[in-house]
């Protein structure tokens, strides 16, 4: 039946996402305090698993014809609100960073970056990661325009997913070789908090793109109907922009 509103069925996914997110933040505090990592990984896996199951059900609703243009407009608004909430999250992190950097405390020597910190050279691994992430932005845009032109875009979308995995691997290598930890003062805390949460967003965005790649291979998209892929692309560009700010201020300016 045609209608101009979205009829929601009963679903356990919102409460499951809530519980997983609450567990993630709680286990993050436990990890910072006691170094116990298992709960953090379990809750993160739970978030990904519930998100995948929820997304699968939404896809099945769309393929069954339940999503008209009014419903899709609601999805668009929801994604914009979600992106705005993510923006405010990173805005809070950058607020903390600039509060510490522009008015350094006496216990860090009154200068920024703190005295005695051996920072990561921004023109080494961070610059390489910047090139990788910007290249992934180009490849995902290429995939989008190829689809709009009614051409194949699976290769460029696959390339984007590979670059996401490459970025994550290099980021983990950087953490392993860094000479400071999250416990080394305000800079160490902000550095690992900002880049770590960005890394989680890269992981989530890469899985989102891979999920849409599978849908593309199953012929769920065409040049006129690919809303899920557009959401993934918008999210990925947001991740790109956040990394540019991290590179310029947390890596380069602090160095």
From Swiss-Prot:
Functional note: Component of the cytochrome c oxidase, the last enzyme in the mitochondrial electron transport chain which drives oxidative phosphorylation. The respiratory chain contains 3 multisubunit complexes succinate dehydrogenase (complex II, CII), ubiquinol-cytochrome c oxidoreductase (cytochrome b-c1 complex, complex III, CIII) and cytochrome c oxidase (complex IV, CIV), that cooperate to transfer electrons derived from NADH and succinate to molecular oxygen, creating an electrochemical gradient over the inner membrane that drives transmembrane transport and the ATP synthase.
Top enzyme category: translocase
PROSITE patterns hit by this protein: COX3
Membrane topology: Multi-pass membrane protein
GO cellular component: a single term: mitochondrial inner membrane
Keyword line: Membrane, Mitochondrion, Mitochondrion inner membrane, Translocase, Transmembrane, Transmembrane helix
InterPro entries: Cyt_c/ubiquinol_Oxase_su3 (IPR024791), Cyt_c_oxase_su3_dom (IPR033945), Cyt_c_oxidase-like_su3 (IPR000298), Cyt_c_oxidase_su3-like_sf (IPR035973), Cyt_c_oxidase_su3_a-hlx (IPR013833)
Reactions the enzyme catalyzes: 4 Fe(II)-[cytochrome c] + O2 + 8 H(+)(in) = 4 Fe(III)-[cytochrome c] + 2 H2O + 4 H(+)(out)
Subcellular location: Mitochondrion inner membrane
Gene: COIII
Pfam family for this entry, one: COX3
Quaternary organization: Component of the cytochrome c oxidase (complex IV, CIV), a multisubunit enzyme composed of a catalytic core of 3 subunits and several supernumerary subunits. The complex exists as a monomer or a dimer and forms supercomplexes (SCs) in the inner mitochondrial membrane with ubiquinol-cytochrome c oxidoreductase (cytochrome b-c1 complex, complex III, CIII).
Stated name of the protein: Cytochrome c oxidase subunit 3
EC number of this enzyme: 7.1.1.9
Organism of derivation: Ascaris suum
Transmembrane segments: 12-32, 35-55, 77-97, 114-134, 153-173, 190-210, 231-251
């Amino acid at each position: 039946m045609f209608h101009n509103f979205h009829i929601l069925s009963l679903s356990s996914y919102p409460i499951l996402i809530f519980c997983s997110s609450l567990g993630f933040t709680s286990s993050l505090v436990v990890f910072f305090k006691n170094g116990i990592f298992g709960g953090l990984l379990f809750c993160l896996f739970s978030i990904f698993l519930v998100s995948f199951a929820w997304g699968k059900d939404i896809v099945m609703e769309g393929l069954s014809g339940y999503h008209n243009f009014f419903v899709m407009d609601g999805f668009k608004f929801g994604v914009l609100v979600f992106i705005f909430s993510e923006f405010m999250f990173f805005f809070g992190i950058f607020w903390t960073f600039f509060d510490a950097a522009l008015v350094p405390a006496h216990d860090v020597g009154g200068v920024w970056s703190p005295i005695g910190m051996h920072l990561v050279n921004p023109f080494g691994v961070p610059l390489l990661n910047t090139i990788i992430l910007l290249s992934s932005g180009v490849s995902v845009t290429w995939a989008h325009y190829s689809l709009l032109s009614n051409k194949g875009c699976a290769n460029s979308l696959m390339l984007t997913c590979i670059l996401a995995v490459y970025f994550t691997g290099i980021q983990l290598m950087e953490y392993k070789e860094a000479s400071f930890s999250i416990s080394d003062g305000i800079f160490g805390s902000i550095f690992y908090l900002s880049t770590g949460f960005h890394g989680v967003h890269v992981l989530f965005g890469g899985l989102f793109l891979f999920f849409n790649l599978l849908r593309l291979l199953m012929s769920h998209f065409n040049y006129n109907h690919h809303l899920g892929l557009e959401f993934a692309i918008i999210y990925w560009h947001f991740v790109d922009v956040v990394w540019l700010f991290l590179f310029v201020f947390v890596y380069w300016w602090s160095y």
